[in-house]
Amino acid sequence: MAALRVGTRAVEGRFQASNGGGGGGGGMAPSSRLVAAHREAKPRSSHSAAPWKLPRRRAGAMPLWRVAVFASVALNVATLALLLHHYATSPPPHHHHHDAGLATRSSDAAVHRRARTASSMAPSTGKPAVTTDSVINLDHGDPTMFEEFWRETGDAAEVVIPGWQTMSYFSDVTNVCWFLEPELDRQVRRLHRVVGNAAVDGYHVLVGTGSTQLFMAALYALAPDAAAAAAGEPISVVSTAPYYSSYPAVTDFLRSGLFRWAGDADAFKGDSYIELVCSPNNPDGAIREAVLDPKTGNGRTVHDLAYYWPQYTPITKRASHDIMLFTVSKSTGHAGTRIGWALVKDRAIARKMTKFVELNTIGVSKDSQMRAAKVLAAVSDGYERRPEQTKETMTTPLRLFDFGRRKMVERWSMLRAAAAASGIFSLPEETSGFCNFTKETAATNPAFAWLRCDREDVEDCAGFLRGHKILTRSGAQFGADARYVRVSMLDRDDAFDIFINRLSSLK
């Protein structure tokens, strides 16, 4: 059609030019360029050598340009009629096919958007994969062993947070810990009741960025106020050796005038102190009690129960100390969520600890709290039937503590066999007890191995193992002999298997 119109305009131009400058019929005068072109053109033959003249139109005949215009209009009308006829006689379109196409395209677009979002927000994978020649880093207690369990839970531990949620600083202004999410409070109490490892009735639940922040908050809350500290010595912070290596580092990091690290509790002779009791103990897994009697002096105690869970040790009693610290990193393996909690009896102490977190970080990430609450709920669901469930509707439960204990029993068996095969390493004796949670006798399987190198020419066990591409933490950092090292038992299977093979080959 467009080509036809272009051709018509060309024809019209030629016929208009033939009408002359003032002839009848309303024709337009030819352009000066067209006339000049005809004047300059060479004759095509001897018959056309005479000067070129505009032909005259016959009287009474219809101009040819009008014929061309009429033909063009007729052609357009005919074409339009054919199109209308085709549309009128065609069957109606199937709207459900059209809608399905739109839905498919919309669905595809949504998938692509999600893929782009997932790609742009892909999380880190943590430590790189290892090979038989890799350096195996077991210095940190990175609990990636639990990834295997959580991969099988589907959406049981997933949480979706809309963009408008968790925007306020505040969670519950009526609570002592005003930035604690109510759902995390509920799930913490629920899990402790399910496991039976700590009392929760009559306790304040406080949340922190890991239990380390709450440990610092406890020191702040238990220490004398600034005026009293200025008039005397900072209060001493002690723990029985071997003690957790971060205790002295964290205590003295800011060089506070309120408290200072004073070393082994067994060697302490002062009156004012804060004793840290880690049970099961990091690094050796021993069950600990306070060694200092607060009745004989001005002493307070903080119980670090990060490892008091059924996968590591029998649950022999329901702990009910004044201040108890826990963390999701060792209970469920979610170290990257950075959530810890404290159970605190005294309201005034709870307020001071909350004030420390407020001044330190203005609260704790609500997003992390919501994820931690969902994770803890998934753990409890594995052992506790929900009210809406019946025996018929219950699916096979995914039980974290069963998985954890099975893995730890297997790994400790492998480690003891490797130490025996090498002949130069020794481990603490295995202990056991009746577990109120599993209702059976269970052995202790600590999250860390307290490994000693018995070879006479090795005085630095960490250095010796480093030479064989095994990174551990020296016993010297725990207030103990450098012949000892702490070894994480919580890494992925591939790294742990390589470690076992290397250890068994050392002589």
From Swiss-Prot:
Q: Which residues hold pyridoxal 5'-phosphate?
A: Y169, S211, T212, N282, D304, L305, A306, Y307, T327, V328, S329, K330, R338
N6-(pyridoxal phosphate)lysine modification sites are K330
> Which phenotype arises from disrupting this gene?
Strong dwarf phenotype and pleiotropic developmental defects affecting all organs. Reduced endogenous levels of auxin.
Q: What is its EC number?
A: 2.6.1.27
What tissues contain this protein? Widely expressed.
Q: Which CDD domains match?
A: AAT_like
Q: Which GO terms describe its biological process?
A: amino acid metabolic process; auxin biosynthetic process
The pathway where this protein functions is: Plant hormone metabolism; auxin biosynthesis
Name the keywords, alphabetized: Aminotransferase, Auxin biosynthesis, Pyridoxal phosphate, Transferase
Q: Where is the signal peptide?
A: none
Q: Which cofactor does it need?
A: pyridoxal 5'-phosphate
Catalytic activity line of the entry: L-tryptophan + 2-oxoglutarate = indole-3-pyruvate + L-glutamate
Molecular function terms from GO: carbon-sulfur lyase activity; L-tryptophan:2-oxoglutarate aminotransferase activity; transaminase activity
Residue ranges for the region (Disordered) are 91-135
Described function: Probable tryptophan aminotransferase involved in auxin (IAA) biosynthesis. Required for auxin production to initiate multiple change in growth in response to environmental and developmental cues. Functions upstream of YUCCA1 in auxin biosynthesis. Required for polar auxin transport.
- Which protein family is it in? Belongs to the alliinase family.
Protein name listed in UniProt: Tryptophan aminotransferase-related protein 2
Q: Which organism is it from?
A: Oryza sativa subsp. japonica (Rice)
**What lineage is this protein's organism placed in?**
Eukaryota, Viridiplantae, Streptophyta, Embryophyta, Tracheophyta
